[in-house]
């Protein structure tokens, strides 16, 4: 079972541990917070890679951010990081820009009314 646990020192310090069966499996740091949009970085422990950890953890992050009234996630991924590009596409992200250094993708969490 995958879960995320807030480890920030305050409600605005958006850092999370990723736990798999109560064992540390990685971390997520939310940055570039510009409501209603945010960006994040995710790192999965080497021994936990290719086991679906990020695929299970990111929707949990998105639910947490929706509770905080965020509506859009934006990520920048190195073009050679094909695993992350595939993961984010599978989660519904759309490519919005690309240059030699990064592919920028975004996901709308809540449709504006």
Regions inferred by a protein language model and the residue ranges of each:
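Conserved acetyl-CoA-binding loop-helix of GNAT-fold acetyltransferases
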Residues: 44, 50-64, 82-90
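Acetyl-CoA-dependent GNAT
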Residues: 1-39, 47, 99, 110-112
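Short cationic/low-complexity microdomains
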Residues: 18, 69-88
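Conserved catalytic-core motifs of GNAT/GCN5-like acyltransferases
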Residues: 6-7, 32, 76-77, 89-108
């Amino acid at each position: 079972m995958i879960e995320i646990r807030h480890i920030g020192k305050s409600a605005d310090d958006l850092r999370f541990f990723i736990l798999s069966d109560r064992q540390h499996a990685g971390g997520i740091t939310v940055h570039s917070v510009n409501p209603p949009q945010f960006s994040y970085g995710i790192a999965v422990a080497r021994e936990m890679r290719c086991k679906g950890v990020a695929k299970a953890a990111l929707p949990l992050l998105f639910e947490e951010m929706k509770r905080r009234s965020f509506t859009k996630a934006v990520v920048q991924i190195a073009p050679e990081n094909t695993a992350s590009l595939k993961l984010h596409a599978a989660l519904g992200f759309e490519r919005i820009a690309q240059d030699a250094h990064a592919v920028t993708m975004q996901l709308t969490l809540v449709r504006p009314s």
